[in-house]
């Protein structure tokens, strides 16, 4: 079954699932949250809620590089760092060096500001707007760093490798 966002009558059900997902995260039930996120993606494969970004981060953060790659592969044209930089890190974790290098360079081409925020040990937090996040600005790069730098740090050699590849 599909519940496409474009159909206004489907929106209450999709919103309810996303709210349940938020509650699962709040309660610390990440397994339930991941299952709900996957359900939202199955029902609405165009992913108007951006579940793909959350799922890619959470799968990689929990050590499931293959699941992160599955999500990234389903949205090959999405330039979001949550997909592209996480794809590179997932490939690096799996020891797929050539794919990791290609993915990292592609991620950097799509979101060139991310490396400037992700790779240094310390960076100044940019001004964040109450109105939203820019597609490829310092704010988006900062938010990616804030969400994922620890995951990069926990992957032995990943930050050093990325610095070398992008240096």
Model-predicted segments: where are they?
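Residue-level signature for tetratricopeptide repeat
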Residues: 16, 22-24, 56-58, 90-91, ...
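TPR-repeat structural position
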Residues: 29-30, 65, 97-98
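Long, ordered, amphipathic alpha-helical scaffolds
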Residues: 89-167
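Catalytic phosphate/metal-binding cores of nucleic-acid and nucleotide-processing enzymes, i.e., regions
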Residues: 20-29, 33-38, 42, 58, ...
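Solenoid-like repeat scaffolds
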Residues: 38-45, 71-81, 105-113
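Short coil/linker segments at helix-helix boundaries
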Residues: 1-28, 46, 52, 106-109, ...
